[in-house]
Structures are given as structure tokens and as C-alpha cells.
Amino acid sequence: MVMAQKLKEAEITEQDSLLLTRNLLRIAIFNISYIRGLFPEKYFNDKSVPALDMKIKKLMPMDAESRRLIDWMEKGVYDALQRKYLKTLMFSICETVDGPMIEEYSFSFSYSDSDSQDVMMNINRTGNKKNGGIFNSTADITPNQMRSSACKMVRTLVQLMRTLDKMPDERTIVMKLLYYDDVTPPDYEPPFFRGCTEDEAQYVWTKNPLRMEIGNVNSKHLVLTLKVKSVLDPCEDENDDMQDDGKSIGPDSVHDDQPSDSDSEISQTQENQFIVAPVEKQDDDDGEVDEDDNTQDPAENEQQLARVKDWINSRHLDTLELTDILANFPDISIVLSEEIMDQLVTEGVLSKTGKDMYIKKRDKTPESEFTFVKEEADGQISPGKSVAPEDYLYMKALYHSLPMKYVTITKLHNMLDGEANQTAVRKLMDRMTQEGYVEASSNRRLGKRVIHSSLTEKKLNEVRKVLATDDMDVDVTETINKTNGPDAKVTADVSTCGGIHSIGSDFTRTKGRSGGMQQNGSVLSEQTISKAGNTPISNKAQPAASRESFAVHGGAVKEAETVNCSQASQDRRGRKTSMVREPILQYSKRQKSQAN
């Protein structure tokens, strides 16, 4: 009892956090390799992990391939992890080196600020804590909670893999790394890895994979999150009807992206109730018990409806999907979630745009959606009026898409210079489809066809008036030549270039000074960027600025500021990615000889 109390009160150091995360990665990769049959069974030894109270299969270096995988982990991944460069590790099984993909295990990492010990995460808590915030790791994380979260994640991963179809005999094992670009040196490559081209960084899926969020472990100084994609889902007929955003197979299969206070309340009996499909009752954050799908409790249903409705109203995005509800309310069953969405459609809160896809209804009509466009054109915009970030990003998407014949998510994502991830870009495309600018059907090779009409032309002209040329792609050399002399220096707040800001992501901006630029404008000196810390999340959140916040000296936007913003976009375009130098090629003939 005394030892247990000491363990509970033990201080979690940064080294403890790093070692726990390293061990979790080992356990996950070894379990994946064993259960998915990537190596013969004789390559694994049983190993006990007292800290997690579980037994695992440890991969031994029996041949060149198994040694190579161990080296990737121990010498490559760990090097990037301890330097706090590593953002995402993607452990992939493909048909060939170039694809298509079979399965992908994505491990994401968030690091704490060394001063405040706060782990910055994009938090959408479940339950009634709908506003989210910063998770204070110093106050909330205990060793017991870490152990519970780790067990939960590993057991969920194991149960998922046991439900998947058998891995094909011929496959290729690849590992890729993404980095926090604001702290990672451009020339950095961990051992056994090399820089990969933009084409090599792309991921090709022949069909829509099953996508699941397995869980996360907050070890106070570092947060590890695991997500899985696979085309070997025995329920693929259901997945074929789902959109490319990916779906989970049940509400209990999607765990919180972020740690919640409920992690510390997990009892010993609950610890063994980690399931892949919703077949058992589990307590949620409020101590409520999920009812069986066949049992209807009107009072409970009304309460869940109110929770979901409040959460939807608090969202800054208008579009959402059924999977958003399942991910943020894992205690609500699929059946009840569908009923709630149907009820919200009936009440006029939502409008259905497709299978399991919805958009919040607005009071204004589509024709008045961009009324501020006309007001600005007529000089009626008040100085303090700003454009909402999501509308600003949508206008940029329209600006790039409407002149084209066909548009794809990848093409639009590249044109936006990384200001939105592919999920956000997909939602922008859905919105364009809903508003009649893009056809709903898609050509596999060309993408979705843009509808060219008088309405499209009118919308494009309106968008151009708002964005003007200073907020879009700028010829850097031409802009430099227009500055008020070569020594002109203007301090520019580029923390919200593109109208979007995200904590701990590659959207985050810092203040820069334009004076350090070279004459040709093609290179921005490193001295122009001031960094507040040496971790990916050391820059605290700043309020998002409107277009007017870039105006100086009576509202005239200096061209040098525009160069800074454009240069930041160019930097985002070159997102650093590494892949292993020598992938592991596995063929049936080789595997049979090794198994004998």
C-alpha cells in the first residue's frame, strides 16, 4: 500500500516520459509485426513488461530484415524523438515500395513546453467540456493514469488487428517520418532514413480504408496518439459506402484524441473492457451508463441530444459528419447518434448534404453569404470588420478552384500552401459541391469537374475583390522592386498569414522583420524569424488577425509584408518528410523458407 502511494506521488521526469513513449512504440511495432504475420513466429520471444503488467512478443534480430526494422526504431526514430523533431511516424505495409497501401499505423507526437510543462493539443473533450483547452500535464497526469492509458491503447490495438483479414504474402514494409518544421534543421536525417520527394511522400489507396483512432497516452511531457488505416477490413462493404474521410466501425472504437479527466477514474474491472465493437456497457465521464441499443430511455436520449446540439453550436466549422459525433462522443452508440442527427435535421439545426454528411443551417440565404464582399467593393466595410478565418480560407479555395476545369483534393491542398490539412480541404470541396460550384461525381483520374456558369463567374469576381492580389500568390521579385528603397524595414505580424492559426502545428507563425531579405527576394534570412523556444509548441497562441491587421501607415499594406507572408507560404510547401533508405521487401517464397 505504501509502495503504491509512493508510485502515485512519484514525479514524472522528462526522461521517464521519453522512455515510456519509446517502450510503447516498441510494444506497438512488435505487436503489429507479430499479429499481422510480418515475420515468422520463431523470430519473437515472450517478454514481460512489469511497468504495464503485460506480456508482449519481442522481435529478435534473426535476419537482415528483422535487424533492419529494429534499427529503424532504435537508431532512427528514437533519434528524432529525443530531439523533439518527430511529429508523425507512419509504419506502412504496401503492395510495393510505391504503393498501393495495405495498412498504415500512424503515431503522432506532441511535446511539452520545457518551461510551463503544458502539453499543447487540439483538444475537443467529450462530455460537457465542449470548449476544450490546454491540458495541464503537471496537475493532471499521474503514473497510474499513464499506465491505464497505455494498457488501454495496446489492448485496443491488439483487438483491432485480430479482426482484420490476413495480410497478403507479398508486401513491402516502409516507415516514413514527418517533422515539426519550425525546429527541425532542413538537412537533418536520422540514421537509416533519407529525405523523400513529394511524390514519395504521397499515399495511394486503391479503395477507401477502414480508419480508426486507437487512443493516446499522455506521459506528462509527451503525448503519443495512434491511428490505424487498413483495406483488410472484413466489413469493407459498409466502408465502401463511406466518404474518403474514413469511418470507424463503432463508437467505442474511436477513443479521445486527447486525455480527459476520466482516465484517472478507470477502475480495475473497466480495464479489461476495451472493445472494438459496441457490445458492452461502459461508464462515461459523468458516471452514466450506456443503454443497450434495444433499450430506449427518453430522458437519457434527450440529454444526449442536448450534449450533441451544444457541441455542434460551439463548432466554428459549418460542415460535419457522423464520424465527428462518434469521435467526440464515444459513449453514444451508432444507432443513437444517427437518431440524434436525424432529429437535428428535423429541428432545422442541420441540413443533410450526403450520406452521413451535414452542414449547419444559417439564418442568411446563400445569396447573402458573402454580402461583406459587396459592401467592401462599395467602400461600406467598417474599419473594424474582419473576415472569419473559415470563410477566408473558403474564399481562397474558391479563388484557386473556380478557374480550373477539374479540381482534386491534392491539387487544392498544394495550392493552399499547407494552410489547411487534407481533411479540411476535403470539407471545403464538400462545401463547394453543396453550393453548386463543383459536381458531386468525381473522375478517378481528373477529380471533380468545376461547373462554369454565370453564378460561378460572379462568385469568382466577388472573391477576387475581397482577397485582392496582396493576399494571394505574389511575384516576390516584383514586390521587392516596389518597396520604398532597399533598406525599407517594416515589422510585420505574420502569425496568422492566410487567416488561420493553430497551436503546435505547421500553421503557427512568428513575428518577422522584412529587412533581412536578400535582394532577389528568393531567400528569407534565418534572422528574420524570432523563435520563442526550442520545442514545437513553445509559441503560445495569438489571436487570429483579419486582413486589416496587416495595414500600417494609414491602411496601406507594405509590399515587404506581403513578401513575408508569401515566403511563409513557400516554406510551408516544402514540408520535410523522410523515409527509410531500404524498405523491407517480403515475398511468399522467402517467407516459407524462413518458416521451415
Curated annotation (Swiss-Prot):
One of its GO terms (biological process) is homologous chromosome pairing at meiosis. Its main location: nucleus. Residues 282-295 have a biased composition (Acidic residues). Disruption phenotype: Failure of the pairing of homologous chromosomes during meiosis (asynapsis or non-homologous synapsis) in both male and female gametophytes. One of its GO terms (cellular component) is condensed nuclear chromosome. Residues 15-228 form the HORMA domain. Keywords: Chromosome, Meiosis, Nucleus. It is found in: Chromosome; Nucleus. Disulfide bonds: none annotated. PROSITE patterns: HORMA, SWIRM. Residues 351-449 form the SWIRM domain. The keyword Nucleus applies. Residues 235-303, 562-596 are annotated as: Disordered. It holds the Pfam family HORMA. Required for normal meiosis in male and female gametophytes. Plays a crucial role in coordinating the activity of DMC1, a key member of the homologous recombination machinery. Acts at the interface between the developing chromosome axes and the recombination machinery to ensure DMC1-mediated interhomolog recombination. Interacts with ASY3. This is Meiosis-specific protein ASY1.
